[in-house]
Amino acid sequence: MKGPIAAMMAAMAAIKRSGTVLKGDLYFTGVADEEEQGKGTAYMIKNGPHADGVIVGEPTDMRLSPGNKGLEWIEVSFKGKKVHGGRQKEGINAIQMASRFVSKVYDEYVPLLDSREYPVLGAPTINIGTISGGDQPSTVPDHCKIVLDRRMVPSETIEQVYEELRELGEELHREDPRFQCQVRDVFDGLNLLPHLPFLTDENDPIMTTVKDIYNDRGKEIVIEPFPAWTDAGFISSQTQSKCLVLGPGKLKVAHSVDEYIDIDQMEEAAEIYAETALRYCGRK
């Protein structure tokens, strides 16, 4: 986001220096905690400012991203019975139970998610990101935990996501009464805003304004969903603002040792941000 922030500030400075007076209000909000719990954006949503149109600066390579999937981090814990490895038939291996759950996710649940293809955003996804459990190799483990990443489309609800995962566990319990698992939100109790999906209509003024600018510049218009979570999900679900994710830089080099951004693209972004403000807000 560093490149988009610089381009946005340059755009605002250019408008100020030009002496142009806008009919509407133009805000820059540099929010903190975007990578963790979104506290900066939550503060802005509660206290303002609120805008009709919002551009969220992320490295889209200057492609227009009118939406992203929702996000839930979910912990599934498995309970077993600890015994010495030499008497493992008397125990219940929690890691083995976890592996059965993971297999069921990929064998049965993923195909279901693939069938829920949504316009622009594509199909919802699930990723088993971490697994931990057990104490030592010679002991049957009585505990195991996986943490998964679940990406949602607008046709799904958060409640539905948890119900479906719990149903997978209940099916395994019916097959084997020894199977026990609990499903919970990783951030349960923190009172965070829900990470809902968002999708802005392609005919919304924030979209048509930028598309018109691209056409006038002879720049190819590429519209695609942003593959990662953005604060646009918070803003669009909690306010009346219409959001567009747009910025210089490539996501594939973000968070990397060799992270970089092309200066030419930053300059282009600053020009497009400024022109968007002029056209969207209008001039007095």
Positions of the model-derived regions?
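Metal-dependent amide/peptide-bond hydrolase catalytic core
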Residues: 66, 75-284
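Generic detector of well-ordered alpha-helical packing
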Residues: 1, 34-35, 59, 85, ...
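Acidic/histidine-rich catalytic neighborhood of metal-dependent amide-processing enzymes
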Residues: 2-69, 73, 281
